[in-house]
Amino acid sequence: MWPSAVALSRWLMTNPSAVCGKRALEIGAGCGLTGLVAARLQKQWDADSSNVLDQQQQQRQGVIISDFNTTVLQNLQHNVVLNSVDDICNVVGLDFYQQSGTASSWKGMDGAARDQVDVVLAADMICQLSDAVGAANTVHDALLPGGTGIVVCADAAHRFGVDRFHAECQRVGLETSVQDLGELNKGKLLSMGFEQTAGYVEGMRLLLFLLKKPQQ
């Protein structure tokens, strides 16, 4: 479990409206923690009588969890069932390097064009420069105009290529802001448990990229 996946999941739990009532896609999912949390939040939101979704939101709401590795995809499908979100959550093969950064749809690994989504989620999906390029292309192609990308990565001192991501997002036309997660919510998002995650180093900075695809 990467530290950024835990951090992004905690951020979503404090900002459930970021995914509730929306169609979300997690890219480079690994074990799928972030996508699973998004799906559980959607189910809880829908079950809470104080939260009212219109018919269009109810029909649209759902989560797609993706990765490119066949074994990982099989494990993701198991995790979706294990967490009882298989009614609103699907697993799809997606390779960053098959996305152009100029398209109005994203491609599954079967080559089929897929509908764009409201929200793209990603955590620690960059470990080399080409990943930054591919991830930016994927976020652009996957998002509807007006859609939002929410990405958390360890800083460039710990993940090679992350320092390129901001510029690559701008290249494909995404509006981009970057925040240090340690400075949000009085540091509570990073307050405990990270020593148990893979690759965590004391003092590691986790960066929150908020991306916006302009309306056409």
Where are the predicted features?
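S-adenosylmethionine-dependent methyltransferases
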Residues: M1-Q216
